[in-house]
């Protein structure tokens, strides 16, 4: 952190506060986040062929990701409720992973990167929930399963 940066969600006394964005002009904003869940190759193959007992994993995860984007303000304490104008979700698979990319757009006074991150993490949690029976080992643990590399990969702000 640079010397001139300050924590915007904390008062001088150290109390939590929501940032006042009331005076900021509306701008067009877009944020893209990504992450991946590592799985056993047999689980990824079952997802790709829609052969998972609970149903279409990626369809359910897509709905979960979109719902999470729309409800970020309810789960991240200092997030503003923003008007979401668009959500795009994209899944890709490799032999041992499912990657989810979520792009969020809004027009308003504050960005939407937290919404994109919330969409990714919830979407990947839904994947885990849908395949957990296949991922458990004999002891009920998940030695091959993990959510990793969650990050914001793009952020845009354009004047209207």
From Swiss-Prot:
GO molecular function: cyclic pyranopterin monophosphate synthase activity
Gene Ontology terms describing biological process: Mo-molybdopterin cofactor biosynthetic process
Active-site residues from the entry: 129
Recorded catalytic activity of this chain's protein: (8S)-3',8-cyclo-7,8-dihydroguanosine 5'-triphosphate = cyclic pyranopterin phosphate + diphosphate
Extent of Basic and acidic residues compositional bias: 1-12
Subunit structure: Homohexamer; trimer of dimers.
Family annotation (HAMAP family): MoaC_A
Role according to the record: Catalyzes the conversion of (8S)-3',8-cyclo-7,8-dihydroguanosine 5'-triphosphate to cyclic pyranopterin monophosphate (cPMP).
Assigned protein family: Belongs to the MoaC family.
Name of the molecule in the record: Probable cyclic pyranopterin monophosphate synthase
Gene that encodes the chain: moaC
């Amino acid at each position: 952190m640079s010397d001139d940066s300050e924590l915007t969600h904390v008062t001088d006394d150290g109390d939590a506060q929501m940032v006042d964005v009331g005076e900021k002009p509306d701008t067009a904003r877009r944020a893209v986040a990504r992450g991946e869940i590592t799985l056993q190759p047999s689980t990824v193959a079952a997802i790709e062929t829609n052969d998972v007992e609970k149903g279409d994993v990626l369809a359910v995860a897509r709905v979960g990701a979109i719902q999470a984007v729309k409800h970020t303000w309810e789960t991240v304490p200092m997030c503003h409720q923003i008007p979401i104008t668009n959500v795009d979700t994209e899944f890709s698979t490799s032999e041992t992973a499912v990657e989810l990319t979520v792009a969020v757009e809004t027009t308003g006074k504050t960005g939407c990167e937290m919404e994109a991150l919330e969409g990714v993490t919830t979407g990947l949690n839904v994947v885990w929930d849908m395949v957990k029976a296949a991922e458990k080992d004999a002891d009920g643990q998940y030695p091959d399963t993990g959510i990793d590399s969650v990050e914001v990969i793009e952020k845009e702000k354009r004047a209207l």
